[in-house]
């Protein structure tokens, strides 16, 4: 039977939510009621699949914690008052920590003046953020398009490359196996996981995938495309594959791809949605090899964990195809004042506190600890790898990876798997994680592995 709309029900629900937003604390009964509500509404109105996923990686199979608030810069607190060290970082959102006071203050100050712009008059913060990114990014990157997410930044990059290369008769894109660039139609065409692609086939034509890190495969693909007249418009890459399982290419790979792009007249698009903003020990991962892309995609941590924002930054030569008609590709909320305020504050914090260098130092410490554990538990752990504060522990099979996430949850450390590699648990904490918290994470991982070994031996 069709359900009739109910204004009264919607009003009551929204009023209840607003009351919850105003609260700073909950008593025991309120916590229990909220947990029941959230699970019920996820099941009935969001997506029950999320509940089953959380249940599979949570101690006791209780669907896991219901988030209530950030604790410190580096922790989360659930409705039961339990505090978790965040080693997931919202999949790379919280580079400057949770509720960073500088970022929150900037957004609050802007909110008091003007949350959204008129769309017609010139908005100052968009101009200032574009100027800041032009100064911050490598090479000749100069002009920025702002949006609301990583997949949108990739969509803009693909459209920009098409607009630039179409008059030159170049329409093909080369991406890599294991890549993740988002799930909107264009970005999904570059993404390389069949689970996400098959339900939406056919995707956009003209995309090819080659093995990541294999420069000869890249050269062969570019050559074949040239011979068949399918000339390549752009190569799109992640400097390190995040969702693919934190896969690092061989040293010199990005440099070699840059040279091939120049040789074949293809643009180089670097997707730094996850690796950017200091995550790998440099402001941008491409700086480890001094590689300068034609188009750079940013999002996630750009908003400081406070506001969603993405950016597509390009050279003047490429971006100029939009000069005659700046309305060819736009978005209503992209570059809004609140998001730009958050991004400007985030960049300021990253530079003032030298967080990229901290990411390198603390990342080395964590990775050394995880590699030691891999040596101690070779029956469970296949490898620990990473760069800066983007790390992964790969287990011998999928089930062990899920069990590790569950045991870490029991130790009050939040971790999760990767979308394209189920055996791999990603470690992606805020760059503000303290040395003491790094030590606690390593201790928690050791306890988790010890408990898992006992379980295996008893089975």
Curated annotation (Swiss-Prot):
Protein keywords: Aminotransferase, Pyridoxal phosphate, Transferase
SUPFAM superfamilies: PLP-dependent transferases
Pfam families in UniProt: Aminotran_3 (PF00202)
Positions that bind pyridoxal 5'-phosphate: 150-151, 274, 332
Domain of life the protein comes from: Bacteria
Enzyme class: transferase
PROSITE patterns in UniProt: AA_TRANSFER_CLASS_3 (PS00600)
Cofactor (UniProt): pyridoxal 5'-phosphate
One GO BP: L-lysine catabolic process
GO terms for MF: diamine transaminase activity; identical protein binding; putrescine--2-oxoglutarate transaminase activity; pyridoxal phosphate binding
E.C. number: 2.6.1.82, 2.6.1.29
Record's catalysed reaction(s): an alkane-alpha,omega-diamine + 2-oxoglutarate = an omega-aminoaldehyde + L-glutamate; putrescine + 2-oxoglutarate = 1-pyrroline + L-glutamate + H2O; cadaverine + 2-oxoglutarate = 5-aminopentanal + L-glutamate
Pathway field: Amine and polyamine degradation; putrescine degradation; 4-aminobutanal from putrescine (transaminase route): step 1/1
Residues with PTM N6-(pyridoxal phosphate)lysine: 300
Cross-referenced HAMAP family: Putres_aminotrans_3
NCBIfam families: PRK11522.1, putres_am_tran
Its biological purpose: Catalyzes the aminotransferase reaction from putrescine to 2-oxoglutarate, leading to glutamate and 4-aminobutanal, which spontaneously cyclizes to form 1-pyrroline. This is the first step in one of two pathways for putrescine degradation, where putrescine is converted into 4-aminobutanoate (gamma-aminobutyrate or GABA) via 4-aminobutanal. Also functions as a cadaverine transaminase in a a L-lysine degradation pathway to succinate that proceeds via cadaverine, glutarate and L-2-hydroxyglutarate.
Family indicated by similarity: Belongs to the class-III pyridoxal-phosphate-dependent aminotransferase family. Putrescine aminotransferase subfamily.
PANTHER family: AMINOTRANSFERASE CLASS III, PUTRESCINE AMINOTRANSFERASE
Name under which the protein is recorded: Putrescine aminotransferase
Protein's organism: Escherichia coli O9:H4 (strain HS)
């Amino acid at each position: 039977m069709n359900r009739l709309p109910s204004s009264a029900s919607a009003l009551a629900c929204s009023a209840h939510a607003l009351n919850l937003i105003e609260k700073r604390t909950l008593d025991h009964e309120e916590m229990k009621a909220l947990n029941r509500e959230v699970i019920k509404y996820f099941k009935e109105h969001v997506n029950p699949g999320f509940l089953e996923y959380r249940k599979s990686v949570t101690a006791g199979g209780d669907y896991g914690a219901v988030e209530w608030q950030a604790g410190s810069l580096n922790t989360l607190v659930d409705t039961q008052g339990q505090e978790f060290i965040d080693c997931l970082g919202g999949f790379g959102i919280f580079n400057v920590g949770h509720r960073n006071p500088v970022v929150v203050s900037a957004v609050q100050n802007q909110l008091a003046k003007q949350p959204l712009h008129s769309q017609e008059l010139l908005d100052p913060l968009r101009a200032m953020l574009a100027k800041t990114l032009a100064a911050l990014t490598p090479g000749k990157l100069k002009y920025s398009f702002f949006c609301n997410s990583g997949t949108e930044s990739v969509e803009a990059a693909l459209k920009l490359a098409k607009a630039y290369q179409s008059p030159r008769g170049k329409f093909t894109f080369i991406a890599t196996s294991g890549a993740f660039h988002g799930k909107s139609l264009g970005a999904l065409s570059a993404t390389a996981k069949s689970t996400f692609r098959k339900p939406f086939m056919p995707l956009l034509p003209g995309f090819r995938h080659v093995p990541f890190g294999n420069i000869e495969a890249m050269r062969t693909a570019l050559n074949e495309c040239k011979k068949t007249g399918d000339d390549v418009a752009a190569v799109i890459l992640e400097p390190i594959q995040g969702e693919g399982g934190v896969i690092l290419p061989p040293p010199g790979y990005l440099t070699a791809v840059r040279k091939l792009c120049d040789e074949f007249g293809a643009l180089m698009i670097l997707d730094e949605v996850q690796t950017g903003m200091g995550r790998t020990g440099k402001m941008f991962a491409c700086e480890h090899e001094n590689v300068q892309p034609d188009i750079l995609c940013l999002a996630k941590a750009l908003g400081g964990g406070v506001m969603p924002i993405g950016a597509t930054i390009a050279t003047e030569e490429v971006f100029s195809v939009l000069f005659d008609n700046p309305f060819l590709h736009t978005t209503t909320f992209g570059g809004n004042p609140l998001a730009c305020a958050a991004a400007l504050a985030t960049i300021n914090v990253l530079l003032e506190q030298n967080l990229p260098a901290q990411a390198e130092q603390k990342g080395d410490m964590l990775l050394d600890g995880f590699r030691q554990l891999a040596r101690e538990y070779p029956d469970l752990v296949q490898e620990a790898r990473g760069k800066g504060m983007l790390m992964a522990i790969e287990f011998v099979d999928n089930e062990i990876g899920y069990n590790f996430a569950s045991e870490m949850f029991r130790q009050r450390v939040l971790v999760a798997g990767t979308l394209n590699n189920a055996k791999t648990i990603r470690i992606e904490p805020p760059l503000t994680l303290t040395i003491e918290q790094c030590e606690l994470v390593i201790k928690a991982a050791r306890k988790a592995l010890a408990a898992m070994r006992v379980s295996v031996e008893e089975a």
